[in-house]
C-alpha cells in the first residue's frame, strides 16, 4: 500500500515495516467491517521518504501511519474480498537515534572484553602462532587496525511490536532524545491510538540521562494494563533487559531492569569489529526486536542482555600456549565441550520474564 505523503518518488510513499497488531485473547478482536486487522508504521527512514535514491532523507518525522485491513472474515471463503486503507496521524517528533553506549565504548578492549582484546593482541602465543588475532582473522583483516569497545546499534525508527487491546492500538519505536537537555541518546517514542476515530489517546517518550533504551515491545492485557520491554544500556550500565509499565491513563511509568536482567559485561560480538567484518564496514548489530506476549493478566517479556562474564584465559582455553581445558574457542565452556558462557563470536543472551502489571 501507498501512503499519501511526499517522497523522492512523487506524492506518495511506500509503506515501511507495517507491523500487524496482536490481541491478548479471543475476545479482543475488532469485528467491524467484517473483521478489521490494524497495523501501524512510521515514515522517518529512507525506505519511506527516499525509495528511489535509498538515502538522503531527513531521518525524522512527525507522522504515524495507521492501517486498516477490512473484511478479514472473507479470508475464510473461496473468494476473499479485502480492503486496505491508511490514515496519517500527527504526532510528536521522532528521529533515527544514535548508537547505544556501554561502559568502555570507544576505548581499547581489556581482558574482560575477550574477543575485542584478542583482535588487538599481538603477543600471546597460541596454537596459530604469536598473537591471539591469528585465531580469528587473516593478516589482511588484521591490518584494518586496532579495535575499540563497540557501540551497539539502535533501531532505525521502524515500528516495533503492536498490540490491539481494550479497543486501542499500542505501539512504540526507537528515537533520538536529549534527556534533560543533555547529549543525544537513544530512547523510545510510544503511542496509544483509538483506531476507530483515528485519534491519539496518549503519546510520549521514555529516556534517561546517561542511558540508551532500544528495541521496545509492548504487551497489553484485555483490561488495558501493559508492560513495555526494551534493552537498557548506559555509561555505567552494561546491556540489560528492562521494562516499564504502560496504560492509557498514566502512559508509561518508571523504568526498571527486569529481575535477573542486569548485564554483567560489554557486548563483544563480531559484527562490531572491523577486522571480523573486513572488508565490509562494521555494523554492531544488537538484535532486531524485543518481544512481549500476554498470558491472562500477566505479560511475558523478552529482551537481549549480556548474561555472563568470560575472562580472557577461559576464552582462549587450550588454544593459548599452556592453556587448559577442552572448550571450543571463545565459548568459555566447561569440560567435554560443555555448554559455554557465550558463543564463539558473540555473547548476548535473551532474558525472559513474567510480569503482572
Annotated model-derived regions:
Residues 1-357:
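C-terminal PAP-associated
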